[in-house]
Amino acid sequence: MPSMKRRKLSHTPPQGEAEDGFSDSETSQASLQETPGNDEKIEATTTKSFKDLGIIDSLCEACDSLGYKAPTQIQAESIPLALQGRDLIGLAETGSGKTAAFALPILQALMDKPQSMFGLVLAPTRELAYQISQQFEALGSLISVRCAVIVGGMDMVSQAIALGKKPHIIVATPGRLLDHLENTKGFSLRSLKYLVMDEADRLLDLDFGPILDKILKVLPKERRTYLFSATMSSKVESLQRASLSNPLRVSVSSNKYQTVSTLLQNCLIIPHKHKDIYLIYLLNEFPGQSVIIFTRTVNETQRLAILLRALGFGAIPLHGQLSQSARLGALGKFRSRSRNILVATDVAARGLDIPSVDLVLNYDLPSDSKTYIHRVGRTARAGKSGRAFSLVTQYDVEIWQRIEAALGKELDEYKVEKEEVMVLSDRVGEAQRHAITEMKELHENRGKKGATLRNRRIGKGAKRSRDEMDREEG
């Protein structure tokens, strides 16, 4: 493909608006299904390149520079339909390439008719919003696309200034976007051409439904809308009926609880009191690999990170009680491999752009099968192999049986010699004592704020402020 010079496109804005130019990815057979209502059913096709899908040369070059050698299934099936001007429902797991599936058609349309406030992407969490924006900017680098990220936890005035610069793409969490729609003078989305709701099931799980309704009421009806979700719940069905026009459904998974064939999953049946020892044994069995360890609480995440560092492991915590800059810093260190172990609550289970994870360890089992699928989906991505281990104690048997039932199979137990494991007990015990001491100091130093590390969770009856809804608690 011939090399491209960096382009700048401009447009003539509507009367009263400032002139605005471009200034500064499952292994099963993909299927297209008919959605309930008036939407159509069409046959899946096979393509070999982004150009075959109808993507223009400059965007194909951007894909090539990012290492996108061939379209993933969700991209191959959804992009041609999007280019035809259809509304879409995309059912795809994390790691299927769905961000590029909606970003490429939007960028191509933007190049054809450039304008400010062209596209809006709604995401459930702050981290995912930043990642989507980064991917838009990377794919649109040759045309200098300009994005604004509008999420909670950041300064409203700075965001209002960014919106005043007339970005082409806005990536936002719903609560903070509605704040700006209600309070930022001169900001509106009346000229919007594209709306994307990413991780729609997660948006609704976080109770963004009423906020989404308010946002939808102020958007122009003449627009293209894409809804992407890992599952098609009744809530998601209601949302698509309210927001999409005659959509096509694109699905790349026939099984709600399907995992990829390149993922090897095992469990370890162990006594609860020895969980830390078995965890260290497993990490020693797979030295140097990139690992995500999932825990259930903020407190356990912090404790395990301290324990692992005391034993010489490059571990870093990620949870919802860290500041926004600390969370982004933790992700950056893990992506760059300056730390190879990420100890995380389920804030990292969905959507985060962590490309090469070799191993997922469920230190604590999730409470439901869907979360298990999202956790282990962090490995064995894009055709690569991966492993997932789950520590199952005497208190977890019922939950584990439910997970296996949802998967439709019993997972093999990973056999270890107990004597070999218990050799580590003295060293682990010393590290545990160190972690207890450091955690105590951490709580004392934070004073009242230390409560944020004491397993704080939002109960079903409790309400979070709109600004906090895009911040993961656990």
From Swiss-Prot:
Record's subunit section: Interacts with the SSU processome.
Stretches with biased composition (Basic and acidic residues): 464-474
Molecular function via GO: ATP binding; ATP hydrolysis activity; RNA binding; RNA helicase activity
Placement of sequence motif DEAD box: 198-201
Ranges annotated as biased composition (Polar residues): 24-36
SMART domains, per the entry: DEXDc (SM00487), HELICc (SM00490)
Predominant place of localization: nucleus
Start and end residues of each stretch annotated as Disordered: 1-43, 442-474
Sequence motif Q motif, location on chain: 48-76
Organism: Coccidioides immitis (strain RS)
Keyword rRNA processing: yes
Protein name according to UniProt: ATP-dependent rRNA helicase RRP3
Reaction catalysed by this enzyme: ATP + H2O = ADP + phosphate + H(+)
Residue ranges of domain Helicase ATP-binding in the record: 79-250
Lineage: Eukaryota, Fungi, Dikarya, Ascomycota, Pezizomycotina
Gene Ontology CC terms: cytosol; nucleus
